[in-house]
């Protein structure tokens, strides 16, 4: 089998039609040489729909508090609109893409996170469905909606989801696409390399804040559990250029 990479696409890139189109074109080229699992979130689209439906939501340490109404909107946006838009874009580039959520076939089972509502923390990956898709040369496009042991939907952070899948499938590389040039220092300059041992310090001294916290924690966890290379890159610069921050052991 070709070497596997896991790519996480999300943030405001999901609302940038031009950037998304270019990204999918690049991904189609990469898919000729490597197996790919594409994981996506879509926070801005979820926020847009929540505002449209006059539903309030809040964030706790970069993670969205998810009540029943928020969960319903999140599942609609992630498993529906965003997932199928990405699949359509890949199909147009002659990639055999299949859109699923992490809930399908109980691919990722989570435990509910305290104080965050219907938010899940992955505890088990069932690889069968995704393995079948990869073996048959399909590119899985996976929305960040998972489930608990009783098949109840849970909103799972897409960075965390990408990390656990990269670990489970022993990915050669994990790439997080963002709308910034990687992790920035206090002078807004890109930190080109971060050692895992320094991650907690960078969070404590507030160099890393907000939505970048779960992202960098996912990077560190992936490296600790065997993924060789993890990148946080500027999606606007493209996957091939790899402009951003690399996290290493």
Regions found by a protein language model. Give the residues of each.
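C-terminal catalytic "cap/lid" subdomain
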Residues: 1-249
